[in-house]
Amino acid sequence: HTDAKLKVEVESHNLMDGAARGASEGVMLALNIGAVLMAFVALIYLVNQGSTALFGHSFTEIMGWMFRPFAWLMGIPAQDVAAVGQLLGTKTVVNEFVAYASMSDMIQAGTLSPRSVTIATYALCGFANPGSLGILIAGLSGLVPERRKEITQLGLKSLVAGTLAVFMTACIAGILG
């Protein structure tokens, strides 16, 4: 049995001071997150435009091609692999909201089978994208600035882990469906 001693530094002098400091720090954290999110969105746009200029295809489209084998492994029918791969690319490069909006258009057009819709719903349900990574880095770095290097080093790993986690869930949906 070990006794742990925790020393808490109190920076506030009373309830009103604590509330004011908390509100101030909260606003600064929100502004930091907003600024980093805008920077990441601008970076995504830059990469997509640069890729289109260099290769004739956006980075989102290229990622869609790269995700086709994953779509197939999840159990997506062959006729829908390209469309779902594109949705996965959109989710990974942009975000899940844009991907779900695209999937909604595909559902209304009748281009996706019900099985593909079910599996893709699970595969798109995650926050593994650059915008969310920016929020994570800004939020955690604002709370523990001395660990910023460690947080940024884990960023890419967290994207991969988050993507694989939702893909595994989609695989289970594919097996059960």
Stretches found by the model and what they are:
Residues 1, 50-57, 143-147, 175-176:
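Membrane-interface elements of multi-pass transporters and channels
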Residues 1-4, 44-51, 132:
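Short acidic (Asp/Glu) and glycine-rich catalytic loops that position anionic groups and cofactors
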Residues 8-10, 73, 109-112:
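Helix-boundary and loop/linker segments of multi-pass membrane transporters
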Residues 13, 17, 33, 37-41, ...:
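Conserved structured core elements
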Residues 18-22, 65, 154:
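Amphipathic alpha-helical interaction/coupling elements
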Residues 24-108:
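Transmembrane helical segments that form the transport core of multi-pass membrane transport proteins
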Residues 92-177:
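C-terminal transmembrane helix pair
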